[in-house]
Amino acid sequence: MDRHRYLSILTPELVAGVVPAAYELFMTERRGSIAIIPPVDRSDESRVESIIRAHGRPIIAFAGRMGSGKDHACDYFCERFGAIKLHIFESGLRRIGLFYGRAIDKSIDRSVLQAVGELGRRLRPQFWLQMTFEEDLLRILDRDRPVVITGVRYKTDVRYLATLGVRTFIIRRPGLVLAGTPEESDPSERDLDDYHECAELINRGTVGDFDALLAETARDISLSELVPVTDTGRECPRIFP
């Protein structure tokens, strides 16, 4: 994200309320000074990673641009296999929602989501991902159900997830029509465009075509722990209502 746009979107009050660990960094940059990245406590990181690696049920992730079909793919696995859906930015979404006192609306809040996401990444690349894992993923791993992760947008996240045994699928949607908004050109939307080091799903047809591709994907990756559920019309379960 362009630094001038980044600073014009966020306010000191929002940063203090949503990502206080980055407050001094943000204020220093706002004054035009050279920022020194503060150290972040990572004492729980190895414990969290060990728990995730030892989890006996599948954890898979879907990556791609906005509108590519990430959430639909997660919902498919929730409905067919009883998986639990988790957004990789769940921790940030919750904090921003609490700050605003309302539910997040991506149609109007996307620029703030991108700015807050980038600010956390200034502290370390996996800042929000690891916050989400510590606060949210660990609480659902003991439910003995598969987990599907949505919202993956960076190469560093894909590679980090791979070290934990999480397989990521990048969804490409060649026919996606863009509106030309600044949010569409944000680095979070473009970072995976040239990345081809993991499996890719091409979403180029109808919803039915995409569902067929997802069904084939479930078979091909041999997720033997995935057991189809009978109620395919139920709402995709998430951590928070």
Swiss-Prot record:
Gene from which the chain derives: ORF76
Source domain of life: Viruses
Record-linked InterPro entries: P-loop_NTPase
Entry protein name: Uncharacterized protein ORF76
